[in-house]
Amino acid sequence: MTNKCLLQIALLLCFSTTALSMSYNLLGFLQRSSSFQCQKLLWQLNGRLEYCLKDRMNFDIPEEIKQPQQFQKEDAALTIYEMLQNIYAIFRQDLSSTGWNETIVENLLANVYHQIDHLKTILEEKLEKEDFTRGKFVSSLHLKRYYGRILHYLKAKEYSHCAWTIVRVEILRNFFFINKLTGYLRN
């Protein structure tokens, strides 16, 4: 009797997990929560912007990110996925001049990686089941150029403390836009 009950519970949990993983509502909730945590971690990194104003740079985030127009769920998820991959790559650069707490940076990277992994799983499931065509997905090329400008800036400034402070603020802006895109993940 107990084994039968345990089997039913296990099957129910497996089914629930699969059903939930397909839900963009759940993805939106998890994404919002994780993005908030990333923003919190970024604020904990030291660096006073007022000392670095001379190093300011307009990285020119793609207009489709700043003012998204009727994204489909899949488009928003793919855009967020690509943004997070690039954010992860940026924070894997030389951070030695920042004086940042390594634990905070590691937590940030772990959180971003977790978001990427979760998005990848959901997207793979969706893409397998549906005939997917990219609608208003922000061009990968636009995003690559944008993040390329950030990486070039860091390199040109020799990964200085002020350069990282400016980039940290830019990545905080990214999470604002990611949260905006997350609104398109509702079922």
Curated annotation (Swiss-Prot):
GO cellular component: extracellular space
GO biological process: defense response to virus; immune response; negative regulation of Lewy body formation; neuron cellular homeostasis; positive regulation of autophagy
Subcellular location: Secreted
Disulphides: 52-162
Signal sequence range: 1-21
Assembly mode: Monomer.
Protein name according to UniProt: Interferon beta
Source species of the chain: Macaca fascicularis (Crab-eating macaque)
